[in-house]
Amino acid sequence: MFSNFDFSVIPPSLPYIWQGLVFSFRLTVTAMLGGIIIGTLLALARLSGGKALGFAAKTYVDLMRSVPLLMMILWFFLLAPFFMKITPETSALITFTLFQAAFYSEIMRAGIQSIPRGQINAGFAIGMSYWQTMGNVVLPQAFRNMVPVLLTQTFILFQDTSLVYAIGATDLLKAADNTGKLYGRTVEMYIFVSLIYFAICFSLSMFVKYMNKRIAIIR
Amino acid sequence: MIQIQNVSKWYGSFQVLTDCTTQVSKGEVVVVCGPSGSGKSTLIKCVNGLEPIEKGSIIVNGTKVNDPATDLPKLRSHVGMVFQHFELFPHMSIIQNLAIGQVKVLGRSQDEAHERGMKLLDRVGIKMHANKYPGELSGGQQQRVAIARALSMDPICMLFDEPTSALDPEMITEVLDVMVELAQEGMTMMVVTHEMGFARKVAHRVIFMDHGQIVEDAPKEEFFGKPHSDRAQQFLSKILNH
C-alpha cells in the first residue's frame, strides 16, 4: 500500500515544518512555565484558608477543568478581538497558559499537601515566616515529589498543542498540513509529523525517568 | 523566662488543655511527663505559638505569645525547638539544614553560617557527615543534627517535644548525652519526655500532666521521692518498676 506514497515531498518542506515545531515548543514551554507559576499561586490561594481568595481560585480551577480545551481555544480566539488586536499564535499562548494553570494548580495542591505538617512547623520553629517556609521548605519538596506528574501533564500539553490547528495558528501539525496540501501529499506529511511527535515524547519520557532518579529525595 | 498562665485550649468541643499554669526560670531544666494524650506535646507547642491557645496567656522572655501583635517568627527565632520526628529538611544537606535559618532569618552570610554550623556539628559529633543528606543518617544522628540546627539560631531557651520517642533504644543515649551536656551548661530547657533517667540526672523540676491538666509540679527530689497525687504515683510506679 506504500507504493503510491511519495515521501520526496518531505525534504523541501523541512524549513517550514521546523518553524511550526518551534512554535509548538514555544507554546509548550510558555504554557508550562506560566502554568506552573500561576498554578502554584492558585494552589497556595486555595490552601491559604482565606475564604474569598480560596473560593475565587477554586471557581477558576473548576471552570477551566470543566470546559474542553478546544472550546477554550476557540472561545478565546473569537472573543479576544473585541478587546485587543491578537494573532492566532498569541491567542493560543494565552489560552494554553491559563488553561494549564488550572491543571498544574491541582497537581501542586496535592504536592503541597503531601508535605507533612511537621516540616512546616520546623520551618516556623527556626523563625521563618509563612512565605519563607513555603519557598524554602514546602515548595522545593512539593516540586520534587510532583516532578513525574508535572512532566506527564507537560507531555499531554505538548500533544494538545496540535489543537491550535482549529484557529489557524501555525504549529507543527498546521505546518505539515499546509505543505501537505501544497504538494497534494497530506497523508505522507501526517505520517511524518506523527513520527516527530512520537520521537519527541518518547525521548522526553526517557529523560523524565533519568531525572526522577537524579532528583529523588533520599528518605 | 517562660510563664504559662491559666492556659486552656480546645480542639472543637474537645478540651485538650485545662487551666495550665507553670513557669520555667532562666537556666532551669523542666521535664514534662504524663501518659499519652495528656496534652504535654500540645502544651509545649503552645509555648512558641505553633498551636494557638483560646484562654490564658503565655509569656516568653517578656513577649506575650498569644498577642496578635507579636512578631511570632522573631520570637521563634530565639526559641529552639526539637521535634519527635526530627523534621530535618530532607532536600538539603546537613550543613544546609544548619545554615538556612541563620542565613534567611538572622541574616548571617553563608560563610559565617557554615562556620557556626560546622562548630555545632562537631559538638554533636556529626561533623564528618556535614555534606550528607538527612536520609543517609540514623535516627539518633538526625536528632543530634536537629538539636544542632536549633542551637545554630543561638536560642535563649530550648523546647524538646519527645526527642527520643521515635528512636531505637540504642540511639536514645547518644541524644540524651547531648541534652545532658546542654543542661549542664545552663541552657533553659523545657523537655517533654518519658526518660526518667534524664529527669533524675538534670531536671530541676518535673511536671506531671493528665487529661490536659497539670496534676503535679514539683522539684525533682520531691517528685521522685513522694508525689502528692495518686495519678502521678501510679504513673511512676508503672514506668519505674522495670
Mark where each language-model region is.
Chain B
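ABC family nucleotide-binding domain
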Residues: 1-220
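C-terminal boundary and immediately downstream tail of ABC-type ATPase nucleotide-binding domains
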Residues: 211, 221-242
